[in-house]
UniProtKB/Swiss-Prot annotation:
Its main location: membrane. InterPro entries: Helicase_ATP-bd, Helicase_C-like, P-loop_NTPase, SEC_C_motif, SecA, SecA_CS, SecA_DEAD, SecA_motor_DEAD. It is found in: Cell inner membrane; Cytoplasm. It comes from Acinetobacter baumannii (strain ACICU). This is Protein translocase subunit SecA. Transmembrane segments: none annotated. NCBIfam families: PRK12904.1, secA. Belongs to the SecA family. Zn(2+) binds at C892, C894, C903, H904. Gene3D superfamilies: Helical scaffold and wing domains of SecA, P-loop containing nucleotide triphosphate hydrolases, SecA, preprotein cross-linking domain.
Length: 907
């Protein structure tokens, strides 16, 4: 009430922003006559002039009016398109590091060229980030003539790209690519063995297309680069036989003989007591569990991991909804966009469990080598902006997490689309039949094109089957028709066209009423001017016919969890002032209604005695649906915030490690760095045998001499020194031993020569850093899985996580230094040939490393057991079984033949 009163007096924040920006637009428009009078050569010459002025200290803000006027004039000459005033406002919004919400069809791609051009003048590079490779390639090629006319270079990055080509793309003034590729390149750049192998040159300015999809929908799923771990396919195959013998419990707190409880909201499962006993008996019969042994003993947690993954695969993940089978492989379907995600795999053994369920070849599990989240990656940019048709519903989250304001850009022409009330049916069959009947009614009335939005591939195929039975020609656009996507969308506005699309979010192509005559022309082998004239004339007639029929009709077959994605579907109609109609058809069996809408609504509708083909429109039901969506949005926001709290801790550690790595790669010699490591390791080693501030009787001098001999291969007469100098205290001893160890290292270094020594140092430091960072990521993942249990002890899980993570990090740094010092002390002096071979192997390892790129499952926050937990628990248990040797480099007492530090002493 108060907010609306203040807004009525002073105007809303958005109105004030638009008023300020319109003054800048007036300045740009005032320059148009002058800029229009320039020749092509003079117009192109403006770019080097602007760059020089920027280098001389003039700010981009000061250059903006003139630069925007130049970009608009160039677009008019090269592309035949002139930026509208509202697009200029959008360009200013992007330049100022904000989100521009612009309705579908208002020209976001053209709007983005303004901010790209202005910010490219700094010479630090602009990244334009899209949701898929097709859009990145399309937008780059569409804008290439404009930017090249203005003297700017343009590049595109994509997966499996040649390294030299990708490096060149990053060096361009403007680089197009997907959010996944930019994120993975950042991680890959921090796994290289030389600075020359790095591709990204810095994160200066980014414009994110469909910013809500990338920063909101995909923010929940961390980016992971992982490598293959040991093969356990036999376990997946064996345990896959268990879930069909189990049945779910209907209610969480009511025991009804069920074996497990499903939490659909969290996509997790929890076994009941009966479930534990049943699974234990099955495992005993298979010989995977010893008689009388508990499934939850520390040594059997790997079995819990496999059983949990198998149950989730059978009961939570459905074929043609969450994944499809393509060429004998399980391919994930993005629930937000309906696109397949080839090469991506679920983690926590879930992907292998699904492969076992489908009877496919089981690929090995993956171990995390590097990880980050989109939230933290995009916050690394000095300036970030975005554009979308729907962001206002998530404006609070954009501001809280990314510090981005949302500016709603007015439309060039008024919106006249007719958004009709939802119709709610008793079940899905009744809903689908009503949709078919509505399509037939629309077709009887005229030639209006129809777009049907579905939430899953399964729903699209059911509707497709019913349309075939009704004899209605139609196109289907889902993950299975990815290759034909552009063609299908291009003609979805043609007269009488019926198109079924799974999750229209992020499709990125406008639906033009009457169809796309240019797309038809492009399909002809040798088009003539007559062909062009004929197709254009036909389109003009079709366009007019479709307008008279009421424009594009949108039929939503289900409400999405997010109001924003519903709005994206609606937004396909009514572009640039065109007419259009939209309506959603719902049923009580829809997931949103079933899980979130509440039993009261369902009970009320059943009590009304509705028949299958009857629908209701009721304010209470509509409110319940909207409240359900708000609940889901709030829950997802909480999940993202929670993920960010924990990843912020990881992020600080990641930045330290990556910064340290860059310093190591940049240094010609690491001698000073390695010598400092020697001092720190000596101090820690001596403290183990000579406790700080202790008396001589507590000193274990013999143990210290043995450790120096075993770990470093150095014989030092420490006892003799103490006898000769009674005043030698703990501090003096640390200094004397460190000096002696460093002196001997310098002798070995001199024997190797500076060049060979520098290479050997870099090799050992990077290998140790990467190896232990990888193990640290697994330990951090395990820590996060179980940290919620600290809440039962009246402790704050977040604070406990920070404390434990810090201890793990400090411990990791100590182990890295110890490994480097011991390896450098004991390695034999290599020949030049051995050094060359070592370098070649390292390079080969970097290039041949089999990496897979995943989106991690956010359900990890709920505390499920994971592979990393299994490994750590096994390790912890076995450490208690065997005695700890005097040195970490001594053979492991378990008899494996490995060093203790590589076996049961592994941290």
């Amino acid at each position: 009430m108060l907010a609306s009163l203040i807004g009525g007096i002073f105007g809303t924040k958005n109105e004030r922003e638009l008023k300020r920006m319109r003054k800048i637009v007036e300045q740009i428009n005032a320059l148009e006559p002058t800029i229009s009078a320039l020749s092509d050569a003079d117009l192109s010459a403006k770019t080097p002039e602007f760059k020089q002025r920027y280098n001389n200290g003039e700010s981009l803000d000061k250059l903006l009016p003139e630069a925007f006027a130049v970009c608009r004039e160039a677009a008019k000459r090269v592309m035949g398109m002139r930026h509208y005033d509202v697009q200029l406002i959008g360009g200013i919004t992007l330049h100022e590091g904000k989100i521009a919400e612009m309705r579908t069809g208002e020209g976001k791609t053209l709007m983005g060229t303004l901010a790209c051009y202005l910010n490219a003048l700094s010479g630090e590079g602009v990244h334009v980030i899209t949701v898929n490779d097709y859009l990145a390639q399309r937008d780059a090629e569409l804008n290439r003539p404009l930017f090249e006319f203005l003297g700017l270079s343009i590049g595109t990055i994509y997966s499996m790209q040649e390294p030299a080509e990708k490096a060149a793309a990053y060096l361009a003034d403007i680089t197009y690519g997907t959010n996944n590729e930019f994120g993975f390149d950042y991680l890959r750049d921090n796994m290289v063995f030389s600075l020359a192998e790095k591709k990204q040159r810095g994160l200066h300015y980014a414009i994110i297309d469909e910013v809500d999809s990338i920063l909101i929908d995909e923010a929940r799923t961390p980016l992971i680069i992982s490598g293959q771990s040991e093969d356990s396919s036999h376990l997946y195959t064996a345990i896959n036989t268990i879930p069909p013998k189990l049945r779910p419990q209907k209610e969480e707190k009511v025991a009804d003989g069920g074996h497990f409880w499903i939490d659909e909201k969290q996509r997790s499962v929890e076994m009941t007591e009966i479930g534990y006993e049943t699974v234990e008996q099955e495992l005993i019969q298979m010989g995977l569990l010893a008689e009388g042994e508990s499934l939850y003993s520390a040594t059997n947690l790997n079995l819990v991991h496999h059983v949990s993954a198998a149950i989730r695969a059978h009961f939570l993940f459905q074929r043609d909804v969450h994944y499809i089978i393509h060429d004998g492989e399980v391919v994930i379907v993005d629930e937000h966009t309906g696109r397949t995600m080839p090469g991506r795999r679920w983690s926590e053994g879930l992907h292998q469990a699904v492969e076992a369920k489908e009877g496919l070849a089981i690929q090995p599990e993956n171990q995390t080598l590097a990880t980050t989240t989109f939230q933290n990656y995009f916050r690394l940019y000095k300036k970030l902006s975005g554009m979308t048709g729907t962001a206002d519903t998530e404006a609070a989250e954009m501001k809280e997490i990314y510090g981005l304001d949302v500016v709603i850009i007015p439309t060039h022409r008024p919106m006249i689309r007719n958004d009709q009330n939802d119709l709610i049916y008793l079940n899905r069959n009744g809903k689908y039949n009503a949709i078919i009947q509505e399509i037939m009614n629309i077709r009887q009335q005229g030639v209006a094109p129809i777009l049907i939005g579905t939430a899953t591939i399964e729903a699209s195929e059911i509707l497709s089957s019913k349309l075939k039975q009704a004899g209605i020609h139609h196109e289907v656009l889902n993950a299975k028709q990815h290759e034909r996507e552009a063609d299908i969308i291009a003609q979805a506005g043609s007269p009488n066209a019926v198109t079924i699309a799974t999750n229209m979010a992020g499709r990125g192509t406008d639906i033009i009423l009457g169809g796309n005559w240019k797309a038809k022309l492009a399909k002809l082998e040798n088009p003539t001017p007559e062909d062009e004239a004929r197709l254009k004339a036909q389109w003009e007639q079709d366009h007019e016919d479709v307008l008279q029929a009421g424009g594009l009709h949108i039929i939503g077959s289900e409400r999405h969890e997010s109001r924003r994605i519903d709005n994206q579907l609606r937004g396909r109609a009514g572009r640039q002032g065109d007419p259009g109609v939209s309506r959603f058809y719902l049923s009580l069996e829809d997931d949103l209604m079933r899980i979130f809408a509440g039993d009261r609504v369902v009970a009320m509708m059943r009590a009304m005695g509705l028949k299958e083909d009857e629908a209701i429109e009721h304010k209470m039901v509509s409110r319940s649906i909207e409240n359900a969506q708000r609940k889901v949005e709030a829950r997802n926001f909480d999940i993202r915030k929670n993920l960010l709290k924990y990843d912020d801790v990881n992020n600080e550690q990641r930045k330290i490690i990556y910064s340290q790595r860059d310093e190591i790669l940049a240094e010609n010699t690491l001698q000073e760095y390695v010598e400092e490591m020697h001092r720190e390791v000596m101090q820690a080693m001596i403290a183990n045998f000579i406790p700080p501030e202790s008396i001589h009787d507590q000193w274990d001098v013999e143990g210290l001499e043995n450790a120096l001999r075993i770990d470093l291969g150095i014989e030092l007469p420490v006892q003799e020194w103490l006898e000769q100098d009674r005043r030698l205290d703990e501090e003096g001893l640390v200094e004397r031993i460190s000096d002696e160890v460093i002196a001997r290292y310098r002798q070995r270094r001199a024997q190797m020569g500076d060049e060979s020594a520098a290479m050997l140092e870099r090799h050992f430091v990077l290998n140790s850093l990467d190896r232990h960072w990888k193990d640290h990521l697994a330990a951090m993942d395990y820590l996060r899985q179980g940290i919620h249990l600290r809440g039962y002890a009246q402790k704050n899980p977040e604070q406990e996580y920070k404390k434990e993570a810090f201890n793990l990090f400090v411990n990791m740094l100590g182990v890295i230094k110890t490994d480097v010092v011991t390896d450098l002390s004991r390695v034999h002096i290599p020949t030049p040939e051995e050094l060359a071979e070592m370098e070649a192997q390292q390079q080969q390892q970097a290039e041949a490393m089999k990496l897979s790129f995943e989106h991690d499952d956010v359900d990890g926050l709920t505390g499920e057991v994971t592979a990393s937990q299994e490994a750590l628990n096994d390790s912890a248990t076995e450490q208690q079984t065997f005695p700890v040797p005097e040195s970490r480099n001594a053979p492991c007492p378990c008899g494996s033949g490995l060093k203790y530090k590589q076996c049961h002493g592994k941290i």
